[in-house]
Regions:
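Inter-helical turn/loop segments and adjacent helix faces that build the functional surface
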Residues: 67-71
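Amphipathic alpha-helices of TPR/Sel1-like and other helical repeat/solenoid scaffolds
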Residues: 53-66
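N-terminal intrinsically disordered, cationic/polar leader segments
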Residues: 1-55, 72-104
Length: 104
């Protein structure tokens, strides 16, 4: 650590050398799924953003698999995407149901 208590430039470089690109992508996909779930919630509904999250996750799943990411991690991300797709479909149907309709 430098005098200011912050890591030095060399320490930061060493830390970056220990992080794999796949690790960063997995974290980004996980965060994308979380944001997607938030965007299907009634409080923060933005179905275009939720759909973008779904499509991005879908696009990166094979890349992560080919990149050697642990299969269990990829399966977890696929399951998160599937759950997000179900939540998205439910949100779309809720938005299509008239508000005063007792069937919705």
């Amino acid at each position: 650590m430098g005098e200011s208590g912050l890591p030095s430039e060399d320490e930061l470089r060493e830390a970056l050398d220990r992080v794999g690109v796949a690790d960063v992508i997995v974290q980004a996909v996980s965060a994308t799924a979380s944001l997607g779930f938030r965007r299907v919630s009634p409080e923060a509904r933005d179905l275009a953003q939720a759909r973008l999250a779904i499509e991005c996750i879908r696009a990166l799943e094979p890349v992560l698999r080919e990149g050697g990411v642990d299969e269990a991690v990829v399966r977890d991300l696929e399951q998160a995407r599937a759950n997000l797709q179900l939540a998205y479909a439910k949100a779309v149907s809720e938005d299509e149901t008239p508000t005063g309709d007792p069937s919705g």
